[in-house]
Amino acid sequence: MIKHIVMWKLKEEAEGADRATNAREMKRRLDECAAIVPGIITFEVTLAQPDLEATYDIVLYSEFADRAALEAYVAHPVHQAVVPFIGAIREGRQCMDYEV
C-alpha cells in the first residue's frame, strides 16, 4: 500500500477569491477525484479547522493499493483538470508518498 499525503498553504487572494473560498472550491474539486481509479483505498480532503492548530490550509490524506494505482490517479484527466487551479491558488505545497 502507498500512502500519499499532500498539504497546501493557499494565497490570501487568488483567482478573484479569498483564501477561504478557494479552499472550499479546491476541496470540492479534489473530492471529485475520490473514486476515479481502482485501487483508491482512502481519500480524505480536509480544511484547516479554526479551533485546531494548523500551519497549512488544506490536506489530502490518501491510501492506494499500490504504486500503479497512485500513478493512475496522478495521470487521470479528472485529477489533471484540478492541477492548474491548485497551482494558481497555492502559496506552498508539501508532499510525502511512502509504502507500508
Residue ranges of model-derived segments:
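A generic hydrophobic-segment detector
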Residues: 92-100
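C-terminal structural segments of small proteins and small subunits
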Residues: 64-89, 93
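Short S/T/G/P-rich N-terminal loop/turn motif that feeds into the first structured element of a domain
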Residues: 1-56, 65-71, 99-100
